[in-house]
Amino acid sequence: VLLVACLVTCAVGSLLYFAHADINKRTDGKGVQVDIPHEVMHHLADSYDWHFTTFGETHVTLHLPIIVKSCVDGEWHVFTSHDVPDGFYFDENHHGKVYERAADGTPVKPWDFSITKLVAQLIIVVVLLLSIFLSCARWYKKRDETSPAPRGFVGTIEMLVMYIHDDVIRPCVGEHQYKKYANYLLTMFFFIFTTNLVGLIPGAANVTGNINVTLFLAFCTMLAINVFANKIYWKEILWPDVPWWLKFPIPLMPAIEIFGIISKPFALMIRLFANMMAGHAVMLSFTCVIFFGTTLGLGAGMGLNLFSVIMLLFMYALEVLVAFVQAYVF
């Protein structure tokens, strides 16, 4: 019941968020004209402000700090998109990134260390995870081995941690090596899972739908695997147990295994990015479809709106499952 209530709330919130954000500027008397590809890409993209919704002519927006080091005067500048100083502007030809003009008018890209919408949500996720696990740690410190098993929220977290630790990491990595990787893999799982779930909240950013984030996660995983690997792992990479003619004189299998060091993290990166971006794009598309109901008759419009809401609920339920599966696979 709680899950259904959450899904309905998120679906209705998405409709209200999208409606207030775009309906006011696209009504021409005949209905609402929505450019679905433009709206989808706009909501998936990163930005220097966090736009939540619009009521009439009032925009509810959080202007995030833009921190750049100028390549023209060499100075640091801190401002927001609401108050851009002279010499800086947002270049729409470069996805709205901040640029500055040199003395001769040439566009120059400064060193950009801004807290964008994606960065802000990453900070929120990190604070949320620290709050969850530190509170659970305090609960355990107050008890000993004779205390009853935890219930409620702490019990749910323990169940999830033990499932990933005992049923996933331990059998997959091996009895002798799993302790070395357990902390990293648990951290990676809960970070991706929480980030995916937070991204489903209406108005939130799609962090794991950004290729830069998944690239960094895949790079960290590649380092963790290869830096802490033992000699058995490298023996299977450089001299695998295959017929000798596959290794000498042409090292076919070693070359394939070495290529796999890069291709496997690359596959993880693309899989997480593509699944999360596609899921959000489909949900946004179904949200946009509801506005076409105003251009149809009453009966057809109500039918289209009902179809859109049902499909949006289905996609939300599917995305909750995908959020867990993608964290599990990664």
What are these regions (language model features)?
Residues 182, 187-201, 212, 216, ...:
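Hydrophobic alpha-helical transmembrane segments and adjacent short intramembrane/lumenal linkers
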Residues 201-207:
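Membrane-interface helix caps and helix-loop-helix hairpins in membrane proteins
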Residues 131-172, 234-236:
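Hydrophobic transmembrane alpha-helix segments characteristic of membrane transport
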